[in-house]
Amino acid sequence: MDMVSLKFIGIGLMAIGMYGAALGVSNIFSSLLSSIARNPSAAENLQRMALIGAGLAEAMGLFSFVIAMLLIFS
């Protein structure tokens, strides 16, 4: 295989990181909704923690996207 083929295989594998971020965010918010349904008085605190967690999960997806773009254009 030449280097261009290996580069595109690496870019395809970076999609796993973006898939993982999407799964993480969906898991965070489904847990948030079930937790608020059980204990509505803690909704404000739970929502704050869920948004921080979702931001961190999205950051992993964005890092993976940036690395994929660097691989494409380098």
UniProtKB/Swiss-Prot annotation:
Give the residue spans that cross the bilayer: 8-28, 52-72
| Coarse class of the protein's main subcellular location | membrane
Instruction: Pull one GO CC term from this UniProt entry.
Output: proton-transporting ATP synthase complex
Query: In which compartments does the protein localize?
Result: Cell inner membrane
Concerning Pfam families, the annotation shows: ATP-synt_C
Query: What does the record say about its membrane topology?
Result: Multi-pass membrane protein
Spell out the molecular function terms from Gene Ontology: lipid binding; proton-transporting ATP synthase activity, rotational mechanism
Q: Which UniProt keywords apply?
A: ATP synthesis, Cell inner membrane, Cell membrane, CF(0), Hydrogen ion transport, Ion transport, Lipid-binding, Membrane, Transmembrane, Transmembrane helix, Transport
Note the site residues: Reversibly protonated during proton transport: E58
| CDD domains, per the entry | ATP-synt_Fo_c_ATP5G3
Coiled-coil blocks? none
Summary of the function given for this chain in its UniProt record = F(1)F(0) ATP synthase produces ATP from ADP in the presence of a proton or sodium gradient. F-type ATPases consist of two structural domains, F(1) containing the extramembraneous catalytic core and F(0) containing the membrane proton channel, linked together by a central stalk and a peripheral stalk. During catalysis, ATP synthesis in the catalytic domain of F(1) is coupled via a rotary mechanism of the central stalk subunits to proton translocation.
Q: Which family does it belong to?
A: Belongs to the ATPase C chain family.
The record's subunit annotation is: F-type ATPases have 2 components, F(1) - the catalytic core - and F(0) - the membrane proton channel. F(1) has five subunits: alpha(3), beta(3), gamma(1), delta(1), epsilon(1). F(0) has three main subunits: a(1), b(2) and c(10-14). The alpha and beta chains form an alternating ring which encloses part of the gamma chain. F(1) is attached to F(0) by a central stalk formed by the gamma and epsilon chains, while a peripheral stalk is formed by the delta and b chains.
PANTHER family per the UniProt record, alphabetical = ATP SYNTHASE LIPID-BINDING PROTEIN, MITOCHONDRIAL, ATPASE PROTEIN 9
Name recorded for this polypeptide: ATP synthase subunit c
Highest lineage ranks of the organism? Bacteria, Pseudomonadati, Pseudomonadota, Alphaproteobacteria, Rickettsiales
Gene of origin?
atpE
